Design a protein with these regions (language model features):
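Glycine/proline-enriched, intrinsically flexible loops and inter-domain linkers
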Residues: 1-81, 86, 90-111, 115-440
């Protein structure tokens, strides 16, 4: 329910600032306490805040519903202070988690005896078992090859750790010490996030805080909706793009997306995309993912507004086809889904480029995923997991940005690579004009 309580602009800014500060603190906690390189060096982690309805208040969930799959097993009325839930199952979460290495922790926030919000911590984990070290392989053909599936479980019950379930999950990793260190870092971040939200509710009061958070979502939705109607003209635009084969056969895959506007109704249709892949490049798109891609573009017009559930207001309907590469059937493998959703983001920009006459950043290359797996002399696995950012497409006013991801991740520092792994880096540099010299 949306609050009707009026909040003055200064208080709203203070509440907004409290959310920003809390997220920064909790993410720094993960970075400084996690053990695996993919989290502490590559920074593939995040903390998000959700309202009592499960809608994003502030963060980067890409339009995903992070709470419903927990509610399916643990209804909100059964939750208690001190509970913490854990899952990574892409299919049970309906694509809110996109592949098994992405572990999610969810904590309800209780204030004055009721749930007023949820805290969500997430990170990409080093290894969860499966067919290969790192739990990712392009030639994997089913989700069981991608590592241990954790359905939504209550890992902490009113402050008490479910040690039996925890030990089972740790036992299924080739690197249980790293997995334990990383999971405890995320648990700590979720706990700290709860503390900060409770302080915020105590400082401003429940009604004022809820009203402020509701107003922020409404403001973002209003801005995004107005911009989408201003920028997207009447008619239809479509894009088809292709991906390399999945490593199982020589078959190439494509997806097709069509953006349509009829009066004030905007729809996105991807039902003409190819059938699901035989390997692991399938992307199980959540209901809100494609809407969020558009919302992120429109958010640039007023970055003073929080990126939240309001970003989904850009699109009225999204149509996907069950059994396609964007909505694969169980138990299709999903480990290398980043190749698909990164290109899908570029296709969203291509649709907007058609709609705006080219006033959009050009398509970007998919980042390089490198896995070095080897047995050490003692018989233990040595694993180096690296995603190498290749940069962004050209912008209407400047060349593209070099060597960065489409999201929040970073490349490994050269010094770290040489200290952590048995290698010597002879050169670490940007290939001059490898994507073209550009206009600027």
């Amino acid at each position: 329910m949306t609050s009707t309580h009026n909040v003055d602009p200064v208080t709203r800014q203070l509440v907004r600032g409290s959310l920003r500060a809390a997220r920064l603190e909790c993410e720094l906690l993960i970075e400084r306490t996690a053990m695996s390189a993919f989290i502490r060096e590559k920074k593939d982690y995040q903390v998000n805040f959700l309202d009592r309805n499960g809608h994003e208040l502030y963060g980067d969930t890409m339009g995903s519903d992070m709470v419903q799959c927990v509610w399916d097993t643990y209804p909100a009325e059964t939750m208690a202070p001190g509970d913490l839930y854990w899952y990574n199952d892409p299919y049970l979460s309906k694509g809110s988690v996109t592949h098994t290495p992405d572990m999610t922790f969810l904590a309800p926030v209780f204030f004055e005896g009721e749930v007023v919000a949820y805290c969500h911590s997430f990170a990409h984990f080093w290894d969860l078992g499966g067919s290969r070290p790192g739990s990712i392989g392009p030639a994997n053909t089913e989700i069981f090859h991608d590592g241990t599936l954790v359905p939504p479980i209550k890992i902490v019950d009113q402050g008490k750790l479910n040690d039996e379930a925890y030990r089972i999950i740790l036992r299924n990793s080739r690197y249980p010490d790293l997995l334990e260190g990383d999971t405890r870092a995320l648990m700590a971040a979720a706990n700290r996030a709860q503390e900060r939200l409770l302080e915020m509710f105590a400082r401003f009061g429940k009604e004022t805080t809820l009203a402020s958070l509701d107003a922020d979502q409404a403001d973002t939705a209003k801005m995004v909706r107005e911009k989408s109607l201003e920028i997207i003209p009447q008619g239809s635009f479509s894009v088809r793009d292709y991906m390399d084969h999945a490593g199982v056969s020589d078959r190439w895959y494509s997806y097709h997306v069509k953006l349509s506007r009829d009066e004030d109704r905007i729809t996105l249709d991807a039902t003409e995309s190819d059938d699901q892949a035989d390997g692991s490049i399938n992307f199980l798109a959540s209901d809100g993912a494609l809407s969020a891609y558009f919302g992120q573009y429109f958010h640039q017009y007023d970055t003073s507004l929080l990126p939240n559930h309001g970003l989904l207001a850009a699109i009225d309907e999204v149509h996907l086809r069950q059994g396609s590469i964007l909505q694969p059937d169980w138990p299709a493998a999903l480990g290398c889904r980043a190749h698909t959703f990164t290109k899908l983001k570029s296709s969203v920009r291509a649709l907007l480029a058609e709609a705006t006459g080219g006033k959009v950043m050009a398509g970007s290359a998919v980042y390089v995923i490198a896995y070095w797996r080897m047995k050490e002399s003692g018989g233990d696995w040595l694993l180096c997991t690296d995603g190498i950012a290749v940069g962004h497409g050209a912008r209407p006013f400047a060349d593209g940005l070099d060597a960065i991801y489409s999201r929040h991740n970073e490349n490994y520092p050269g010094e770290f690579m040489e200290m952590e792994y048995p290698l010597r880096m002879e050169r670490y540099a940007i290939a001059q004009d490898s994507g073209g010299p550009g206009k600027y």
